[in-house]
Each structure stands twice: as C-alpha cells, then as structure tokens.
Amino acid sequence: MDAPVKMIVGLGNPGRTYEDTRHNAGFMVLDRLAARWGAVFKADRQRKCEVAAGPGVLLVKPSTFMNESGLCVGPMMRFFKLDPRSVFVIHDEVDFPLGVIKLREKGSAGGHNGIKSLIAHMGTQEFPRLRFGIGQPRGKGEMIGHVLGKFRPEERELLDVTLGKAEDAVLYTMEHGITRAGNIFNAVPG
C-alpha cells in the first residue's frame, strides 16, 4: 500500500546562477505547486533547506548543492518523523527527453548524485520520485554544461507543458498514490 505524501522535495542547486537550469527541474515544479497553493518558502538554516507549507504537505528545497541534498532531506524526514515512503522527490533525468516524466515507487540512484545523497542520508532507496526528462547533451563530454545550462528558447514551450504535466502527476499522486499515478502518467507519451 502507498504511504500518503507528507513532504515533496524538489532537487536543484541554490542561487540565481542556477535558476532555470536543467538541473533545477525539481525546484521549478515545486515553485509551481507553491504558487498554486499560495505557499511561501522560508529558510530553515538548521536543516539546510527552504520550506513552504502546502495543504497537508511540506514543500522542501535543499539549500545545499545538488550532490549534498541528503544533508537537508534526511534531517527533515527525521525531525518530522516521516516514513521515507511519504517523502516524494522530484528530480531531473538525463535519460529521458524533455517532455517525458516518469513516476517511480523506489529504486537506485541511477547515476544521479542528488539521489545518491538522499539514499545515503535517508538510509533507504524506498522513497517515491518523479523523474523529469531534460534530455542528453548534444555532444560527448558536455554533461556538466548540459545539466547546469539553461533551457534553449525553442524548448520553452515544451518545458512549460512538461512542468504542467509534472504538477498534475504530483497532485494525482497525493490523492491516489504513486502506484495509480504511475499507471496513468508513465503511460502518457512524451
């Protein structure tokens, strides 16, 4: 049985330099949810994050860099005594093209350093997530520039559609659980 979502974590890098970069797809989805609910992020320096309150759920943005996201999420989970399965994580995914989102109940990091940090600090791989496709770099050896780069102007329309789809998937997951949401949103073509 799916655990109810109590905390939604968007992964990204803090600061203006990284706003609207591919690696910050998780932050972008969280910003949309916060706007929908009129929620305002406030700094929680002790737990290294920004937190906003949604309807029965916490929205959390780590204020650490991506590779250290667990330094925020692990302490938040323990402070609020949350089951890891109730911590829903949104992150970028280079293995999917822009336009594709996939929900996953649990699993390995798959090479994503932010997820590796979460697994290390949460002590488990068993937390649901939404993987937000950002596509592969155009050339070999350009991964860092790709994930830290901004979306191109010609990608903006598809980005907006995909952010809306991700927002819908989160809301559906909150109401119906990750299993049912995955059956619907994972079947939708990009």
From Swiss-Prot:
Hydrolyzes ribosome-free peptidyl-tRNAs (with 1 or more amino acids incorporated), which drop off the ribosome during protein synthesis, or as a result of ribosome stalling. Coiled coil: none annotated. NCBIfam families: pth. InterPro entries: Pept_tRNA_hydro, Pept_tRNA_hydro_CS, Pept_tRNA_hydro_sf. The keyword Iron does not apply. The record marks D92 as: Stabilizes the basic form of H active site to accept a proton. CDD domains: PTH. TRNA binds at Y18, F65, N67, N113. PROSITE patterns: PEPT_TRNA_HYDROL_1 (PS01195), PEPT_TRNA_HYDROL_2 (PS01196). This is Peptidyl-tRNA hydrolase. It is found in: Cytoplasm. GO terms for molecular function: peptidyl-tRNA hydrolase activity; tRNA binding. It comes from Akkermansia muciniphila (strain ATCC BAA-835 / DSM 22959 / JCM 33894 / BCRC 81048 / CCUG 64013 / CIP 107961 / Muc). The active site is at H23. The keyword Cytoplasm applies. Its EC number is 3.1.1.29. Disulfide bonds: none annotated. The record marks N13 as: Discriminates between blocked and unblocked aminoacyl-tRNA.
